[in-house]
Amino acid sequence: IQTKKEVSIKCTLRDLVSKRVTSPEDWMMLQPDSYIEMMAQPGGENLLKNTLEICTLTLARTKTAFELILEKANNTKLTNFDLANSRTCQIFRMHGWNWIKVCHAIACVLNRQGGKRNTVLFHGPASTGKSIIAQAIAQAVGNVGCYNAANVNFPFNDCTNKNLIWIEEAGNFGQQVNQFKAICSGQTIRIDQKGKGSKQIEPTPVIMTTNENITIVRIGCEERPEHTQPIRDRMLNIKLVCKLPGDFGLVDKEEWPLICAWLVKHGYESTMANYTHHWGKVPEWDENWAEPKIQEGVNSPGCKDLETQAASNPQSQDHVLTPLTPDVVDLALEPWSTPDTPIAETANQQSNQLGVTHKDVQASPTWSEIEADLRAIFTSEQLEEDFRDDLD
């Protein structure tokens, strides 16, 4: 037999999960009545905390970051959404990249389909758009844990039961390099939490921004090159070097949901099998994002031909020559309807109308003479013989 209190908590929990509530602030804004009701009960703070923890755990275990982003897409805006002119893709276009390929790779990582390459790394100089892209993705996911470098002993204290881990301005990993490598590769590990016991982190996508070369690990004064390649194997490397103008602005919160919906709509599923089908191979550390080139007009509104040069190579096209039919031959050899008028006479008539006289005008062949020459060269037998040679 369930008590009234149990029924109330279960109903509240279902509402919180359905509305994707992941923080006390979201709860206060979206469900203020249930928040006040629980807060007024004895032990209300612990009740709020435990209820919210169940909600975030449910989302982390049943949904991926990509799915949470996709849910927020506005289908009415998707019809006229221009992917190439979105702020995120404008940044990629500044570098001459295939912006569909980059977005597709990011979507695969967010959907936990990147395998060992479980981290999206935006790195490069300041003011190149690293943080605004990462912030837009994190806001679209909602259930995000942040790495706290200031908390030396418990830097991952906020990263349990999350759909995405955001590491802003990452620096030298130092003595935490092994923990970083485990989390960045999507392994299940246990971490220590302040005032609590250890807690398990399930495979969670990571998004990271930095101005430094994080592949160089220094512990004290000693450089540890053995960690360089393992770190590269865990990162989707996106190096941004083009500085943005001062009035570029932030990425709209609705942009990434529309990007994900656009990819799904046009057949770019967020799986590594689909990625290799479109782009030939899995992404690597030194991936060339500029290849293959995107055809002009690939994302113009209403454009249905979304094929890139990767899928339009000559080997994939089977061209079959059509035999030359008799009616085509007759049409080619049919007498022309143009009057039998010399070209020179026509030019003189036009010149006289304009008040201009031409001297020493060389006589040009008439249309009949040109037709006779062409008929002598391209006879019916010759056309059929040439076409038969092409077929052979």
From Swiss-Prot:
Gene3D superfamilies: P-loop containing nucleotide triphosphate hydrolases
Cofactor(s) needed: Mg(2+)
Reaction equations catalysed: ATP + H2O = ADP + phosphate + H(+)
Coiled-coil region list: none
Subcellular localization, as worded in the UniProt entry: Host nucleus
Gene Ontology biological-process entries: DNA replication; symbiont-mediated arrest of host cell cycle during G2/M transition; symbiont-mediated perturbation of host apoptosis; symbiont-mediated perturbation of host cell cycle G1/S transition checkpoint; viral DNA genome replication
SF3 helicase domain residues: 91-253
GO cellular component, one term: host cell nucleus
Protein origin, superkingdom: Viruses
This enzyme's EC code(s): 3.1.21.-, 3.6.4.12
InterPro entries membership: Helicase_SF3_DNA-vir, P-loop_NTPase, Parvovirus_NS1_C, Parvovirus_NS1_helicase
Post-translational modification: Phosphorylated.
An annotated Gene Ontology molecular function: ATP hydrolysis activity
Record Pfam families: NS1_C (PF12117), Parvo_NS1 (PF01057)
Cofactor note: The endonuclease active site can probably bind other divalent cations.
List of residues binding ATP: 124-131
Alphabetic keyword roster: ATP-binding, Covalent protein-DNA linkage, DNA replication, DNA-binding, Endonuclease, G1/S host cell cycle checkpoint dysregulation by virus, Helicase, Host G2/M cell cycle arrest by virus, Host nucleus, Host-virus interaction, Hydrolase, Magnesium, Metal-binding, Modulation of host cell apoptosis by virus, Modulation of host cell cycle by virus, Nuclease, Nucleotide-binding, Transcription, Transcription regulation, Viral DNA replication, Viral genome packaging, Viral release from host cell
PROSITE patterns: SF3_HELICASE_1
Major enzyme class: hydrolase
Reported function: Multifunctional protein which displays endonuclease and helicase activities required for initiating and directing viral DNA replication. Also plays a role in viral packaging and transactivation of several promoters. Binds site-specifically to 2-3 approximate tandem copies within the origins of replication (Ori), unwinds this hairpin region and nicks one DNA strand thereby initiating the rolling circle replication (RCR). Cooperatively binds Ori with host PIF and probably other host factors, which activate the nickase function of NS1.
Family membership noted in the UniProt record: Belongs to the parvoviruses initiator protein NS1 family.
Subunit: Homooligomer; when bound to DNA.
Record note on domains: In the N-terminus, the endonuclease region is involved in binding to the origin of replication. In the middle, there are the ATPase and helicase activities. The C-terminus probably contains a transactivation domain.
Protein known as: Initiator protein NS1
Gene encoding the protein: NS1
